[in-house]
Amino acid sequence: MAASVAAAARRLRRAIRRSPAWRGLSHRPLSSEPPAAKASAVRAAFLNFFRDRHGHRLVPSASVRPRGDPSLLFVNAGMNQFKPIFLGTVDPRSEMAGFRRVANSQKCVRAGGHHNDLEDVGRDLSHHTFFEMLGNWAFGGEYFKEEACNMAWELLTQVYGIPEERLWISYFDGDPKAGLDPDLETRDIWLSLGVPASRVLSFGPQENFWEMGDTGPCGPCTEIHYDLAGGVGAPQLVELWNLVFMQHNREADGSLQPLPQRHVDTGMGLERLVAVLQGKHSTYDTDLFSPLLNAIQQGCRAPPYLGRVGVADEGRTDTAYRVVADHIRTLSVCISDGIFPGMSGPPLVLRRILRRAVRFSMEILKAPPGFLGSLVPVVVETLGDAYPELQRNSAQIANLVSEDEAAFLASLERGRRIIDRTLRTLGPSDMFPAEVAWSLSLCGDLGLPLDMVELMLEEKGVQLDSAGLERLAQEEAQHRARQAEPVQKQGLWLDVHALGELQRQGVPPTDDSPKYNYSLRPSGSYEFGTCEAQVLQLYTEDGTAVASVGKGQRCGLLLDRTNFYAEQGGQASDRGYLVRAGQEDVLFPVARAQVCGGFILHEAVAPECLRLGDQVQLHVDEAWRLGCMAKHTATHLLNWALRQTLGPGTEQQGSHLNPEQLRLDVTTQTPLTPEQLRAVENTVQEAVGQDEAVYMEEVPLALTAQVPGLRSLDEVYPDPVRVVSVGVPVAHALDPASQAALQTSVELCCGTHLLRTGAVGDLVIIGDRQLSKGTTRLLAVTGEQAQQARELGQSLAQEVKAATERLSLGSRDVAEALRLSKDIGRLIEAVETAVMPQWQRRELLATVKMLQRRANTAIRKLQMGQAAKKTQELLERHSKGPLIVDTVSAESLSVLVKVVRQLCEQAPSTSVLLLSPQPMGKVLCACQVAQGAMPTFTAEAWALAVCSHMGGKAWGSRVVAQGTGSTTDLEAALSIAQTYALSQL
């Protein structure tokens, strides 16, 4: 018995350390199989169990786009949306702050970053890039180990009917190095539930200690495993459910400290659970995937899916089935959540997923063009009831998938042509150039997967320059690092321990309502009130709480009240100063304010001593605040104008503003045209010109849920929430019958705004670019900056008009035409870089680039005419013979080459070399050798002999060549040319 338990333990250890996977090695029937249950029923049973039996609140799945978490590419676990609770930073006024016990089914994507299953999808029967995580949570010690284990056991054995003898348990065995004891409490809980000791096994921190990241909340976990073998032979164990008990915090120095509050965080993959309950050895055999696999077979007329892996999967047909089925689910979910295929970050990962799916469907399953988009309705059918956003956006998802598939196929065809053209220039032993492969790849212009490029070359029997490709990849990484936005210096911050201590002491959250205490004077200027406050806490730069700070010390201040706006919601923090009561002549500069779990932390420099309990008076930088207010109100107007112009499907994806400019990211079906950009600006100008009142009011969050047209972001809002309405009182705007939110700007927003729109002055969109397919970033300025942008635009328009007139008059000679072309080139650069209306930039660039083409055409015509004239002069000067060596005036090397070419056309048996003196002693050289004089006499060698004498260089071929040099003795150069040619003839 002991030996069998030890063997089972070793098997479990190996299974865990290889990462849990359904290996599908055993196809014997499962004993005591539970009755088949649809995936939708399994999901519903989980949620209903925790809601109805154990009083959990059901919360919707968060978007797979991480909310304010730059450490993640995608939401990859159920706990992601609850990080503010674990870190203690949740807004105490928000709905989330009231969460005690919750449950949900969370959409998760693991493709890129630390958790990346992309390349494993298709190779086995378990990996997915998209999956659903069923989870239940208890926050702040609502319940802990005993209740969590009891609930999990009850659900699995009583609700789902999984036989107890098929469940195995692992728990934390301790970590002496970290000073952590074995989690015997959890072990004893499982034993008390009747799990035999032989199936309760202990493991170290690698398997049973869960951490959020390098730092942050963490704790021991216990895992429930399912035995696929059902007691027949050795156990085949797969992880089913992970229960994490967060009770520690990993500090920056690597040490562990107890958390102020303990939490329970559990996660169970729906796909794996459904496979168990439906008696399947693979998640792909469940009803979550079978409709997709059937649709793939019908659409591709491929052989049926048989679930084969490895060498048994001849032709990789079943691998392709799994790749396509998984990837179309991921694409559909991501696009419905506003992540579109693009060129960097999550959009780039999504682009790779789409192109991987197209490759497998096209190359292996022989799918027809447009096939991938046809699978979207099947995804919506299987997941749409649980995630309604799939139903709402199904048409957009299908269109985007089909468009990107078509673009990829076009790129593939272009790539084949480029490869064939490049191969024709290579020698038998040459490697394929890394530069060309790079331009074909996902990092270059065409976006082809690099392994596909390598496969195409392999089929041609050509080896890729891998070393060169690695060098280019390193250069690209360095370039991206240089181009990346500089990381903002981390300001003072309150960690989970500091926040926990404040809560333990009963320190109330900062009252920041005074930030809204400002008014509009009859003169049109704003009056910002001061704020009286008391110092409640002081922190040094390293976050240590102190009783006082001294002269010159950078510190953080917590006050009972503040009129400073803390950075959030895309709006920059206020700045200003504070003075101590009775000492108004000593200013304490405040550089920024940040929100930390409901507390506003002011970052200041103390010119003198400051102590706990001191009374202070706060003053915001009025010009800075007013600039932020104008940009924020302008952002709302711009957001509304975009919807009015482009349609109601235009959604804000994010924004950032400061007094200098505003940035707004929005969903767009296609890039904006100049006409649309101008129309958006005009709509904003109209609202500004009407000088409408801006109404702001706090209302219960529930009142905003069903208001048509009201705009909000995927953020956690406080309750009550502030509503900002332009031109319509908030009460009227929130009346669903009024439809007011469809006619004007009405948004949930905690920022500071103008009281009337007229103070925006003007708005000019100065830039736009596609962040990804379907997402556009707009840059805009307001007020005086906008007027300056318009004036500069008009000035450049006049310059373009003048250039047009100059071009229409024509040029007398090549030199004049070249000067005009250079002037037009400088004008193009000026238009491209100017801060001016973007719609006007687009129009002027189209015009000025057309002028450039016309100017170049005029130059070529003048050069041809000049070359013809000089050709005749030279032919008249030289009698018919085998050689012409002479000097001629030419404005450029291209003109000189044309003269040489025309001479040789009119005298085919003559070899020609011409020199053209230029300013500063520079000399141009061009030559061509008659066909009859080769191969002993070559143009490249001829030009090199002459140019090297002049200290220059030459290049070309056996027939034609050119070069440059510098000399004051042209006769000597001509003599060398003559002598060399005669020696070769």
UniProtKB/Swiss-Prot annotation:
InterPro entries to which the protein is assigned, alphabetical: aa-tRNA-synth_II/BPL/LPL, Ala-tRNA-lgiase_IIc, Ala-tRNA-ligase_IIc_anticod-bd, Ala-tRNA-synth_IIc_core, Ala-tRNA-synth_IIc_N, Ala-tRNA_ligase, Ala_tRNA_ligase_euk/bac, Thr/Ala-tRNA-synth_IIc_edit
Outcome when changing W210A: In ATP-binding mutant; abolished ability to mediate protein lactylation
Keyword Aminoacyl-tRNA synthetase included in the entry's annotation: yes
GO biological process, alphabetically ordered: alanyl-tRNA aminoacylation; mitochondrial alanyl-tRNA aminoacylation; negative regulation of cGAS/STING signaling pathway
Assigned protein family: Belongs to the class-II aminoacyl-tRNA synthetase family.
Keywords from the named record: Aminoacyl-tRNA synthetase, ATP-binding, Cardiomyopathy, Disease variant, Ligase, Metal-binding, Mitochondrion, Neurodegeneration, Nucleotide-binding, Premature ovarian failure, Primary mitochondrial disease, Protein biosynthesis, RNA-binding, Transit peptide, tRNA-binding, Zinc
Name this polypeptide is given: Alanine--tRNA ligase, mitochondrial
Cofactor (UniProt): Zn(2+)
Function field: Catalyzes the attachment of alanine to tRNA(Ala) in a two-step reaction: alanine is first activated by ATP to form Ala-AMP and then transferred to the acceptor end of tRNA(Ala). Also edits incorrectly charged tRNA(Ala) via its editing domain. In presence of high levels of lactate, also acts as a protein lactyltransferase that mediates lactylation of lysine residues in target proteins, such as CGAS. Acts as an inhibitor of cGAS/STING signaling by catalyzing lactylation of CGAS, preventing the formation of liquid-like droplets in which CGAS is activated.
Residues reported to bind Zn(2+): H632, H636, C749, H753
